[in-house]
Amino acid sequence: MSLTAKDKDTVRAFWAKASGKAAEIGSDALSRMLVVYPQTKTYFSHWKDLSPGSEPVKKHGKSVMGGVADAVMKIEDLNAGLLNLSELHAFTLRVDPANFKILSHNILVVMAIMFPKDFTPEVHVAMDKFLAALSRALAEKYR
């Protein structure tokens, strides 16, 4: 499922609205992932507090959404644009790439909750395709 020019424009336009709340989106999405998919906690066992909204969760959620913001800027070539992040996750952090899809789903849920009027079906499909493409780009170095 590739991103069309219209999808890319939709992602950019929605991100322009959502980016002001990126840290909140990231914190809530990561919190949800850790609760709903407790197996993902294994990657964060070095944190003292894994509870929803804790400082480590907020900090990493903000970092995740910084990566999403970077991906929006590099939407024309996500594989090349996210090469360093792909290498980090594959070789250093050794995150199972299946978790990218899990976190992407939670990001979509939070965006839909936080922006109910803006999260139209068109935005939903464009953001879903974008986050899937971002996940594939992050998984690129696993091959």
Curated annotation (Swiss-Prot):
Residues recorded with modification N-acetylserine: 2
Gene responsible for this protein: hba1
Pfam family, one: Globin
Tissues in which the protein is found: Red blood cells.
Similarity annotation: Belongs to the globin family.
One CC-aspect GO term: blood microparticle
Residues annotated as domain Globin: 2-143
Amino acids binding heme b: 89
GO annotation, biological process: hydrogen peroxide catabolic process
Keywords recorded for this protein, A-Z: Acetylation, Heme, Iron, Metal-binding, Oxygen transport, Transport
Binding site for O2: 60
UniProt xrefs under InterPro entries: Globin, Globin-like_sf, Globin/Proto, Hemoglobin_a-typ, Hemoglobin_oxygen_transport
Any one Gene Ontology molecular-function term assigned to this protein's record: peroxidase activity
TM annotation in the entry: none
Stated role: Involved in oxygen transport from gills to the various peripheral tissues.
Subunit structure: Hb1 is a heterotetramer of two alpha-1 chains and two beta-1 chains.
Other observations noted: Hb1 displays a low, effector-enhanced Bohr effect and no Root effect.
Name the UniProt record assigns to this protein: Hemoglobin subunit alpha-1
CDD domains given in the database record: Hb-alpha-like
